[in-house]
């Protein structure tokens, strides 16, 4: 298996998980709209809407982290970074992943696992509603999200190593984009295909 295939495989996993949990937005919208209707029109509020909102939002926030990382979409202060040559960018990012990213993610997995196990052992429920909605399932998502982030972090480190060796950042999987960005991707692909066709040894 090539490095590029491995990178795309990890990216695809993060993408699939991110897309799956994106449906939480639809459920949140429908649930919140229903709560507003029954509360203010029928004067009959639900006992579960608040718990549903923070559980689904928490799950969405946690499980979309690896997807955002695979898209290089996390917020960064790149005013100086983008001016650096690719190899310098790769070295800097590799150092930051080793000394800052992975210690934080490992702490998230370790602490999140203990937190989730304690919650599951006592059968923790929400104190915000009279029906006692179970919330230990949400806390199990914390170490799972950390594991996905760690896996995607490995892919990003491999990208850094490839960039240091070749002087170019490896391509990422294309996904839903704004039209302008999609056009830029298409132009880059056409340029890359034209470059490959012009390599020595090709039949003309």
Each model region followed by its residue ranges:
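Alpha-helical transmembrane segments and membrane-interface helix-loop junctions
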Residues: 1-204
């Amino acid at each position: 298996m090539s490095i590029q295939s491995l990178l795309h495989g990890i990216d695809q996993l993060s993408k699939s998980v991110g897309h799956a949990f994106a449906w939480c937005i639809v459920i949140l919208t429908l649930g919140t709209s229903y709560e507003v209707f029954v509360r203010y029109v029928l004067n009959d509020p639900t006992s579960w809407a608040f718990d549903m909102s923070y559980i689904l939002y928490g799950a969405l926030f946690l499980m979309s982290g690896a997807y955002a990382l695979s898209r290089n979409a996390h917020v960064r202060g790149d005013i100086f970074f983008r001016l650096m040559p690719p190899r310098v960018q790769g070295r800097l990012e590799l150092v930051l992943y080793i000394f800052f990213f992975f210690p934080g993610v490992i702490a998230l997995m370790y602490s999140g696992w203990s937190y989730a196990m304690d919650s599951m052992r006592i059968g923790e429920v929400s104190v915000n509603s009279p029906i006692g909605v179970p919330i230990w399932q949400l806390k199990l998502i914390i170490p799972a999200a950390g594991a996905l982030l760690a896996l995607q972090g490995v892919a990003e480190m491999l990208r850094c190593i490839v960039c240091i060796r070749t002087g170019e950042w490896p391509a990422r999987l294309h996904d839903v984009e704004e039209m302008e960005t999609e056009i830029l991707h298409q132009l880059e692909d056409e340029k890359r295909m034209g470059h490959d066709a012009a390599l020595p040894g090709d039949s003309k």
